[in-house]
Regions:
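N-terminal secretory signal peptides that target proteins for export/translocation
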Residues: 1-2
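Sec-dependent N-terminal signal peptides
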Residues: 5-14
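Sec/Tat signal peptide C-region and signal peptidase I cleavage site
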Residues: 17-22
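Subset of outer-membrane beta-barrel
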Residues: 23-317
Length: 317
């Protein structure tokens, strides 16, 4: 089997596990939601707390903690005819300093699938294990009056049957108001916009290049203290992928969250996406002092889709 053909098959298997290869979309490690909390709310991850580096770095200015750490794992259902189970694993830390500044670092790994190679006669040869990983950095700056801006960068390593290295970056801005009221109830509001995964194509050799999944994302989140110990929240976000230019995809998701005593939360939502990317979402979480534990399940809406679950652990202080 020619190397170029092996690369294409490995690419399809790795990306197909997340259904992120809709109409040619690539490198799902740069676009998959790593946050279990917002995954349960229709994957409305643009304006969110927790997993700041990969959601919204500016959101850290809305909390009274200086240091944050998160880790998560997403496990996807097995693909028919492919060995192994696809997983996305993430760890990130962030630090707020000098009132207006915050810095972040993180790491992501995606892999777990096995592909059997064959020669021109159809005889089995070596086994291929495609995977991706990234090292990520971010910086956020509080401009003032609730406005802030941020930028993140990614060092990317991708292995299909050949290796490719590259980089990408994201720029965004947000507004948040933690002192507003709605019907005499204390409320928090946040809106965020960004252009993400900007960068050159990854070159795997043998004539195969993968475009970055460059996209625009806009979203907002609102939470209201309905009564003593009772809080209700809502989130909505949309993403439009315009790269590769021949593989445009539109995704919109939203969800609701109920929290009791600022400790126990239940969540539900729906995510609509072109080309079999839609999901019903649900989950729950527990928060005690600075510790956060969340879980989510994304249920595919059609057989051609892919269901998956995400669990996350975080700590702020």
């Amino acid at each position: 089997m020619k190397a170029k053909h092996i690369i294409i098959i490995a690419c399809a298997a790795l990306f197909g596990a997340t259904q992120a290869n809709a109409q040619g979309q690539t490198l799902p490690i740069l676009t998959a939601n790593t946050d279990a909390r917002t995954a349960a709310m229709g994957n409305a991850s643009v304006a969110a707390e927790g997993m700041y580096l990969y959601n919204n770095p500016s959101a850290i200015f809305g909390v009274d903690k200086k240091f944050t750490a998160d880790a998560s794992a997403s496990i996807y259902e097995k693909e028919e005819g492919i060995e192994g189970t696809f997983g996305l694993y993430t760890a990130t830390v962030g630090y707020k300093f000098a009132k207006r500044h915050a810095a972040f670092a993180g790491f992501r790994y995606a892999g777990g699938l096995k592909l059997k190679g064959s020669n021109m006669l159809g005889e089995p040869t070596k086994e291929y294990k495609p995977y991706d990983w990234t090292i990520d950095f971010g910086y956020a700056y509080m401009i003032g009056k609730g406005f802030s801006a941020y930028a993140t960068g990614n060092i990317i390593f991708s292995h299909l049957s050949k290796n490719a290295n590259g980089g990408a970056f994201t720029v965004g801005a947000s507004y948040q108001n933690n002192d507003m009221t709605i019907a005499n109830k204390a409320a928090n509001f946040m809106v965020d916009a960004k252009v993400a995964a900007i960068g050159p194509k990854l070159d795997y050799g043998n004539g195969y290049k993968a475009s970055m999944p460059t996209h625009v994302a806009v979203g907002g989140a609102l939470s209201v203290d309905m009564a003593d110990k009772h809080q209700v929240g809502a989130a909505l976000s949309t993403r439009y992928f315009f790269q590769p230019s021949e593989s445009k995809v539109f995704i919109v998701g939203g969800g609701l969250e109920y929290t009791y005593n600022n400790m126990v939360s239940v969540r539900a939502g729906y995510e609509y996406g072109d080309h079999n990317l839609s999901h019903f979402t649900m989950g729950a979480g527990v928060k005690y002092r600075g510790l956060r534990i969340n879980g989510a399940y994304m249920l595919k809406t059609i057989d051609a889709g892919s269901s998956y679950c995400t669990v996350g652990l975080g700590y702020d202080f």
